[in-house]
Design a protein with these regions (language model features):
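Flexible, acidic/Gly-rich N-terminal and inter-domain linker regions that tether
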Residues: 1-80
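Generic secondary-structure boundary/loop-capping signal
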Residues: 34, 41-44, 50, 85, ...
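Short glycine/proline-enriched loop/turn "hinge" motifs that connect secondary-structure elements
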Residues: 74-76, 85-88, 129
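Structural motif
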Residues: 80-81, 135
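Short aromatic/hydrophobic contact patches that present stacked aromatics
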Residues: 81-83, 171
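Local cysteine-cluster metal-coordination motifs and their immediate loop/turn environment
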Residues: 84-100
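Conserved non-cysteine loop/helix-boundary elements of the Radical SAM core domain that shape
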Residues: 100-129, 133-219
């Protein structure tokens, strides 16, 4: 998804910076370079990229990776960054290649949270103390598909298992068409200080073509 990012309490001062330039000269566009780069690849929206999530990576290897962090003094000193995927959408945007489930049944989110709670418990059990978290991002899908009660439950689960830093960056993807009354106040009270608002295109014809009707007044 493409987003317009709004950050509370953050100012871009890059234009006024006295820091030395880190610009790198553009490579020469040779036929050999174009031939090497003109190949398909995964959508680079996250790391590791989607093609790295394969069945060959077993549960045992995942536990081993957690164990390496648990026993490594240097790794334990570094805070975690958490990503929680909320896959539900009331309708599908035709351009989207994210993992999603189209439904209007809010009850499905309760079942999803049940399983997510079990996964959080499994991860927490690998650490002797609550791991420190410096970043949290809720993505989707549509995180604002969750009711306020479901969102509170999710955050309670996370904060019970992890120790969030007081200055943690907590961000959430918001669909302004799917925003419950009081949701913004709830998220602010829970420490969220950054939100990404989906604005794919303001042209009504394009919105119709991609099945995402979002008038400017809604945005």
């Amino acid at each position: 998804m493409e987003h317009t990012t709004l950050s509370r309490g953050r100012t871009d001062t890059s234009a006024e910076s006295d820091a030395p330039s880190l610009a790198v000269a553009a490579p020469e566009l040779t036929d050999a370079l174009l031939a090497r780069m003109d190949v398909p690849g995964p959508r680079y929206t996250s790391y590791p990229t989607a093609d790295r999530f394969v069945e060959a990576f077993t549960a045992e290897e995942y536990i081993q990776a957690l164990d390496q962090r648990r026993t490594g003094a240097a790794a334990m000193a570094l805070p975690l960054s958490l990503y929680v995927h909320i896959p539900f959408c009331e309708s599908l945007c035709y351009y989207c290649a994210c993992n999603k489930i189209a439904t209007k049944d809010r009850g499905r989110a309760d079942v999803y949270l049940d399983y997510l709670e079990k996964e959080i418990a499994l991860v927490r059990a690998e650490f002797s103390t609550r791991p420190t978290v410096s970043q949290l991002h809720l993505g989707g899908g549509t995180p604002t598909f969750l009711s306020n009660a479901q969102l509170e439950r999710l955050l309670s689960m996370l904060k019970s298992a992890f120790a969030f830093k007081t200055d943690a960056e907590c961000s959430v993807e918001i669909d302004p068409r799917r925003l419950n009354p009081g949701a913004l106040a709830l998220m602010a009270s829970q420490g969220f200080n950054r939100m990404s608002i989906g604005v794919q295109d303001l042209d009504p014809d394009v919105q119709k073509a991609v099945n995402r009707i979002q008038p400017p007044e809604v945005t």
